Amino acid sequence: MRAGRDERAWIRGAQAGSASDLEALFRSHWPSAWRAAFLVVHDAAAAEDIAQEAFLAAIRNLDRFDRRRPFGPWLHRIVVNRAIDWARARSLRAELELVDAAAPAQPPEVGSDVVGALRRLSPEHRAVIVLRHLLGYTPGEIARLLELPRGTVNSRLRRGLDQLQETLP
């Protein structure tokens, strides 16, 4: 429970302009923010940019953040939305990247076959699968994070899992 109290104190301090509290928030949430972005976009450099942009957006809007709520889900929402936007923009571009030859290191707890299968999903399906099965959010939490109806989240989870089953051995 101490971590929650520390986080609330860091948020209060950051809202008051404390650079050290802002740094503590950043250090605490950077790994999961980067991981969430990476698992959606599958590009280490883009994931870093997305996570940094999400933190900057969070900092700019920290005065509107409700300190009674946990910071992590709020930040993950920003990260995932930006990652989806990036993935959509990338897929709209006609350029095809041969990333497999120079693929970045995968998170150790996710096998390369799973990462490859996730790559084949649409950004929308990939985001809900990552939030649910790799970051541990419930469907209700995902619906709130992404501002989607619960039925849409459930549908994307089911379709995404069905597609993963078809592609995984």
Located regions from the model:
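Arg/Lys-rich amphipathic alpha helix in sigma70-family domain 2
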Residues: 60-67, 77-97
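A short pre-motif secondary-structure segment
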Residues: 128-132
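Amphipathic, Lys/Arg- and hydrophobic-enriched alpha-helical face
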Residues: 26-44, 61, 118, 167
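Internal acidic/polar
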Residues: 3-7, 85, 91-118, 138
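DNA-recognition helix of helix-turn-helix
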Residues: 73, 80, 84, 134, ...
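Structural recognition of an alpha-helix C-terminal capping motif at a helix-to-coil junction
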Residues: 49-56, 60, 69-81, 155
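C-terminal edge and immediately downstream basic/flexible tail or linker adjoining helix-turn-helix-like DNA-binding
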Residues: 2-3, 13, 42, 99, ...
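A short, charge-rich alpha-helical start-of-domain segment used by transcription regulators
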Residues: 11-35, 59, 126
